[in-house]
Design a protein with these regions (language model features):
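Acidic, polar ligand-binding/catalytic clefts
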Residues: 77-138, 149-150, 206-207
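Ligand-binding clefts/hinges and TM-proximal coupling segments of bilobed small-molecule sensing domains
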Residues: 73, 151-164, 235-251
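A ligand-binding cleft/hinge motif common to bilobed small-molecule-binding domains
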Residues: 90, 100-109, 182-210
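Periplasmic-binding protein-like
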Residues: 34-37, 119-122, 196-231
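Extended ligand-binding regions for polar small-molecule ligands
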Residues: 57-69, 216-250
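Bilobed "Venus flytrap"/periplasmic-binding protein-like clamshell domains
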Residues: 38, 52-68, 126-159, 165-167, ...
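Extracytoplasmic small-molecule ligand-binding "clamshell" domains
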Residues: 24-101, 108, 146
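Short beta-strand-to-loop elements that line the ligand-binding cleft
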Residues: 73-81, 146, 162-169, 175, ...
């Protein structure tokens, strides 16, 4: 009995030491998570699960080059839904998630690398819609579709607009066309791209109500040195024109 107890304690100590080393080592593997959010990140086969070379997009290409320059190894997985991968990156050391809008409420929850790209917040309506908006408050009387767990949906909810949320933002394109919602609160260019992928075109922008910057968000336990190396790599990529070159390939 005593021998078993000593062996168990020894094994626990080894795990603790190895775990601490994995968090503190500058060159430790980082586990990166992302979602289908075209044209920034997307599975090549259009599915809601993909890994490594089967993922593409503006942010994916930028992140790959950034990690290569920083000399930090990583694995990349695209999963669904957003709320799940957000929670994993928030709670698990050595994890990160992209792309995420950097908002005041999130500032102290993660360590940030970016910006990777812009994400304007817009209200889309059907081509034949008579809706006219001058400010966000004007949308209160309409049924607004949004993406569950997204910064846009969170912001609308905080302002009392009560968005109708879905697990896949592209579903809002079809709901808008079918008259199930009056407006679609989404990002630009992501929303239009998603709509085209679902065969929906001709939507019109009736309000542009915010402009956010998208980042790589890393768990708070990721070493500061690693964050600094990644940020320096991204800054140099921007100076070299690499970020603009990547953007031009998709837009």
């Amino acid at each position: 009995m005593l021998r078993r107890l000593l062996l168990a304690l020894a094994s626990a100590c080894v795990l603790l030491v190895n775990g601490a080393h994995a968090v503190e080592s500058l060159d430790a593997d980082l586990v990166l998570l992302t979602e289908n959010f075209p044209p920034y990140n997307m599975a090549k086969n259009g599915k809601n699960f993909a890994q490594d070379e089967n993922i593409e997009g503006i942010a994916v290409d930028i992140v790959r080059e950034m990690f290569k320059r920083a000399g930090i190894t990583y694995s990349l997985t695209l999963r669904f839904p957003w709320e799940r991968i957000y929670k994993i990156a928030l709670e698990k050391p050595g994890y990160g998630v992209f792309v995420m809008a950097r908002l005041p409420d999130r500032e102290k929850l993660f360590k940030w690398v970016g910006p990777i790209g812009p994400d304007d917040w817009i209200m889309l309506a059907r081509a034949d819609s008579k809706i006219s908006l001058e400010k966000l408050n004007d949308a209160r009387k309409y049924k607004i579709g949004a993406y569950k767990g997204d910064a846009i949906a969170e912001t609308l909810a905080k302002q009392g607009l009560k968005p109708v949320v879905v697990l896949r933002d592209q579903d809002n394109a079809r709901k808008l066309v079918n008259g199930q919602i009056d407006l679609w609160a989404t990002g630009d260019p992501a929303g239009r791209y998603l709509a085209r992928q679902d065969g929906v075109t001709g939507l019109k922008t009736v309000l542009r109500f915010n402009s956010a910057e998208l980042y790589l968000a890393l768990n708070r336990n990721v070493p500061d040195d690693a964050v600094a190396k990644l940020q320096a790599a991204l800054d140099q990529m921007r100076k070299d024109g690499v970020v603009d070159e990547i953007m031009a390939r998709y837009l």
